[in-house]
Design a protein with these regions (language model features):
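N-terminal ligand-binding/catalytic initiation module
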Residues: 1-157, 390-404, 411
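Solvent-exposed alpha-helices and their adjacent loops that cap or buttress functional pockets
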Residues: 57-62, 98-99, 124-126, 150-151, ...
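Generic structural signal for well-ordered, non-membrane alpha-helical segments
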Residues: 27, 31, 38, 42, ...
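Rossmann-like adenosine-cofactor binding region
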Residues: 236-303, 308-310
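Glycine-rich phosphate/diphosphate-binding loop of Rossmann-like nucleotide-binding domains
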Residues: 76, 81-101, 159, 163, ...
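Adenosine-phosphate binding glycine-rich loop
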Residues: 160, 180-182, 284-406
Length: 416
């Protein structure tokens, strides 16, 4: 057993099993405390909520509570290992919600026979929570599940594997294009992978200005094109009317490569076929589509991002999902819509262009960081993230009409 594996197991097992717990927010030391907390005092908020359902936000924790829900069919890079095996990941997500955005979470692992069973189960318990984070659900079922739950629930439903990845990728890519002197409207983009993250990334990039006809998506059978007869409805959206069939054909002259597929699928020779000043986001974890050392040896005009923390430009969903929910819940949004996602993209993009505080340098164990090829995305430990992203998302929710209440006074106003 490797040292790191044992350390990871010990971290989860000691001093008590798991990573999260429930803490009390009210005193419970006296008989009177208990009378207020439960019977008979609890009857008063019950009556208030029955009379005015919105009072549930006044008298319970609903407004700060997120459900983290999975069926374990696509756990990290490990695959379909079932609901119970996903529990450490869901607890980890809850830890990140609390650590970075002060949000409480409950992890829920669902065993089900059909996709509709899963949808019905989640929809039945949705009103308990202020928002729902879907996690580690395989494609294409994840698309159907999220769509159905958004339609049935009046709280935010967000599949982070799709949209969190898309938001961080889009923010980093917009900055990389700016540094390389290229425009997203003209960029030729190759996407290796056609699952949940890949499709969401490309759809969001289109909303940022990318042209659908400039995108070449590949799955395990090669280029997704209009003459293929084996495509599901989601891949069909990216079927390109082209005679190109291989990675080598589509990557020749390409400006951008986005990998959300598997390890070692992009070679140094492939990279050399790309246009001048290429951009590579090799996001497969733990091993990227091309190792950064190999990529940087092949091209010295490259901007490279990966999902790894030990190299520059880590594409990490923790840069957005805690803060998107923070902003959405704080205005009681009924959904997380495209305007809110784009607001998060631009908040992240803009933050990376600002001077970096000393505390971030210390946490990242570096002496300096400045906007450039090795710093296109903020660092996860940047304390400004919550305020910037949550505020942008909350404002977008209000302006797009999905917020139930106005922006709180001085909401994350710096210096306010």
């Amino acid at each position: 057993m490797t040292d790191f594996r044992q350390q990871a197991l010990d971290y989860h097992a000691l001093p008590v099993p798991g990573k999260i717990s429930i803490e009390l927010t009210k005193p419970a030391e006296t008989v009177r405390d208990l009378a207020l907390a439960y019977s008979p005092g609890v009857a008063e908020p019950v009556r208030a909520i029955a009379e005015n359902p919105d009072d549930v936000y006044k008298y319970t924790a609903k407004g700060n509570l997120v459900a983290v829900i999975s069926n374990g069919t696509a756990i990290l890079g490990l695959g379909n290992l079932g609901p119970m095996a996903s529990k450490p990941v869901m607890e980890g997500k809850a830890l990140l919600f609390k650590r970075f955005a002060g949000l409480d979470s409950i992890d829920i692992e669902v065993t089900h026979r059909t996709t509709q069973d899963f949808i019905n189960t989640v929809a039945s318990i949705a009103n308990t929570f202020g928002g729902i984070n879907l996690e580690d659900i395989k494609a294409p079922e994840c698309f159907e599940i999220e769509k159905a739950l958004i339609e049935r629930c009046d709280i935010p439903v967000f599949h982070d594997d799709q949209h969190g990845t898309a938001i961080v990728t889009s923010a980093g890519l917009l900055n990389a294009l700016a540094i390389q002197g290229k425009s997203i409207e003209k960029a030729q983009i190759v996407c290796m992978g056609a699952g949940a993250a890949a499709i969401a990334c490309m759809e969001l990039l289109i909303q940022c200005g990318a042209q659908r006809e400039h995108i070449y998506m590949l799955d395990s059978k090669g280029v997704i094109h209009t003459r293929r007869t084996d495509l599901n409805e989601y891949k069909m959206l990216f079927a390109n009317n082209t005679d190109k069939r291989t990675l080598q054909e589509v990557i020749t002259g390409a400006d951008v490569f986005v990998g959300v597929s598997g390890p070692n699928l992009l070679s140094a020779d492939d990279l050399r076929l790309m246009a001048d000043k290429p951009i590579v986001f090799a996001c497969s974890n733990p091993d990227p589509e091309i190792h950064p050392d190999i990529a940087n040896s092949a091209r010295d005009d490259l901007i490279m991002a990966t999902g790894r923390s030990d190299y520059p430009n880590q594409v990490n969903n923790v840069l957005c999902f805690p803060f998107i929910f923070r902003g959405a819940l704080d205005v009681r949004a009924s959904a997380i819509n495209d305007d809110m996602k784009l607001a998060a993209v631009h908040a992240l993009k803009d933050l990376a262009r600002e001077p970096v505080p000393e505390s971030v340098l210390t946490a990242a164990s570096v002496s300096a960081l400045s906007f450039g090829k090795d710093y296109i995305i903020p660092k996860p430990m940047d304390p400004r993230l919550c305020g910037r992203v949550a505020r942008a998302v909350a404002i977008a929710a209000v302006e797009s009409g999905v917020a139930r209440i106005d922006l709180p006074e001085n909401y994350f106003v710096e210096g306010g």
